[in-house]
Every structure is written in structure tokens, then in C-alpha cells.
Amino acid sequence: AFTFAMVSVGLAAPAAMSHTPWVVGVSLAFSTFFAVAAMIIAVLKTALALSHMLSKGVEETALPTLWIWVPILTVLAITLMRQDHGISHTLGLASAGTWLTPLLMVVSAQLFVLLLGGFAMRNHRYLAKVWRGDVKGAPVFALICPGVALSVSLQFLINKGFVAAGLLISFSMVYWIFSVEPLVVMVVTIIVFMRLSR
């Protein structure tokens, strides 16, 4: 699902950057196809995984994948913003309006996924094992992607959501207070990455 989401965001780039209507149209069509495919695959995989987890529990090696929805949602949100830019600027159609509500929904879903995954990881003491270095290998690096994705989503929420809706003034004191949150998430992610790389 994440692969399809990444293809989708790449195919949405021409919609955001091109001034040629047919290029924007092709970009919209293909990026939408891959975005929908990513969502269908992610929902089906999640349903199957939940069924398995409820009957047999979670294997420790699969724990990092519990947070995969976080980067998928970020990438799909970027896809939609790129598409919206092409629709409103190049095709001259009215924009769908503010991004505040969709971005709040994305960040809320991401926080919910992080909480659910965090509870499962806590039951296995997985994060403590990772921090001590007891868990090694490539799968553990999947813990980095959600941190990066959440930081990006929070930046979009602040700038394309709160500022664009007039709830925050760019570079005001409150703006900088809000901006500390994604920076903290990124710093923690970098620290975890450095710890895993030892």
C-alpha cells in the first residue's frame, strides 16, 4: 500500500507544477488511480491483520508495521494537495476550500494509529527493547518513517490548515509555539535513528 501511495504522490507532482491542462488531467487520473489502489490495499491488509492479531496476537517482528498508516496518510494528503493545486491554478476550477478539516482528520487518524500501535508495542515492551539494542535488523528502521511523516503532517496542518484558515498568523508567537511540536517529533525521530544506527 505504501508503494502505491508513493507512486500516487509522484504522479500528482505534474498536477501541482504544470501549466499545461492535459498534463494536469493525465496527472490527476493516474495519481487518483494509485491513491485509490493504495487505500483499498491498506484497508484490506489492515482488516486481515486485525483479524489475525485478535485471534493469534502480534508477532514482535511485525510490531513496526502497526504504524504504517502514518506515512500512508501523509503521502495521500500530499497527493490530494497537489491535485487541488492543479485543479484550482491550472484548470481554473474553484478549489475545494480550506484544508483545515481534511488535515485535522489526517493528523487525528495518525495520532490514533500511533496510540493503538504504541499500546501493542508497550505490551511487548518492544520500544524498550529497541532502545536497549536488543532488537536489531532492517525491520526496526520502519519505526523512523512514522516520525518523519507525522512531522510533515503537522507542518501542513499548521501552514495549510491553521494559517490558511486565518486561525494563526504566520511567524507570530503562537505560530512558533505550534511549530515546536513538529520540530520535537523530528528531533526525537533523529535521536531514535541515531540510536538504531549504532
What annotation goes with each model-predicted range?
Residues 17-28, 87-100, 154-177:
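Extracellular/periplasmic helix-loop-helix junctions in multi-pass membrane proteins
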Residues 76-80, 90, 130-135:
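Extended helix-rich, non-globular scaffold segments
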